[in-house]
């Protein structure tokens, strides 16, 4: 394992997918939660119930996704994830029902299980000596998204909550 931080051109797609995953996580954690509370008046108890439902459901769902990724490959799994997220984000932008929004929230969280495909993609394309340093770079890229997306999209939220989700779908 290389102990130096190395940014390699051949891993550009992995880095891009990592940034998108970090941005998407922030949209889910911050702005989907805002939507549930601000637009639909969800209480702390209701949001907590959704968190618990998501956690319980993913205990069952994540192993299925892992087997699916093994069967169809990372590319197909990630295409499915991102197409699904486009649908979820566009739906967040236009939803008028709190119950449908809650369903979208659970569906949105289900797609987190597909994030493992990004890691297995790196394992397939990466040099074993680069794994630690590439993971360090990816961790940093993910955190860059975690810092900038809430700030930028928070400003956008002040203009239009729907615009946040349309921008997330475009990303």
PLM regions and their residue ranges:
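Short amphipathic helix-loop junctions that connect adjacent transmembrane helices
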Residues: 30-47
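Intracellular juxtamembrane helix-capping segments at the cytosolic ends
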Residues: 113-126
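Transmembrane alpha-helix termini and helix-breaking/packing motifs in multi-pass membrane transporters
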Residues: 1, 34, 148-164
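Helix-to-loop junctions at the C-terminal end of transmembrane segments
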Residues: 61-74, 157-158
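Hydrophobic core of transmembrane alpha-helices in multi-pass small-molecule transporters
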Residues: 99-113
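Loop-to-transmembrane helix entry/capping segments in MFS-fold secondary transporters
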Residues: 44-45, 128-138
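Juxtamembrane intracellular "pre-TM" segments in multi-pass secondary transporters
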Residues: 1-23
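Structural signature of the two symmetry-related core transmembrane helices
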Residues: 76-91, 169-170
């Amino acid at each position: 394992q290389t102990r130096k931080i190395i940014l390699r051109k051949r891993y550009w797609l992995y880095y891009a997918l990592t940034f998108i995953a970090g941005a998407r996580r922030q949209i889910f954690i911050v702005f989907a939660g805002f939507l549930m509370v601000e637009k639909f008046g969800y209480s702390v108890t209701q949001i907590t119930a959704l968190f618990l439902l998501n956690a319980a459901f993913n205990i069952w769902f994540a192993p299925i996704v892992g087997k699916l990724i093994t069967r169809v490959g990372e590319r197909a799994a990630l295409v499915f994830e991102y197409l699904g997220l486009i649908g979820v984000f566009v739906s967040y932008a236009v939803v008028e029902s709190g119950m449908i929004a809650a369903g979208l929230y659970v569906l949105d969280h289900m797609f987190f299980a597909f994030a493992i495909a990004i890691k297995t993609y790196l394992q397939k394309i990466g040099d074993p000596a680069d794994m630690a340093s590439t993971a360090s770079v990816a961790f940093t890229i993910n955190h860059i998204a975690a810092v900038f997306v809430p700030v930028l999209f928070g400003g956008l939220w002040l203009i239009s909550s729907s615009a946040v989700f349309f921008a997330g779908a475009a990303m």
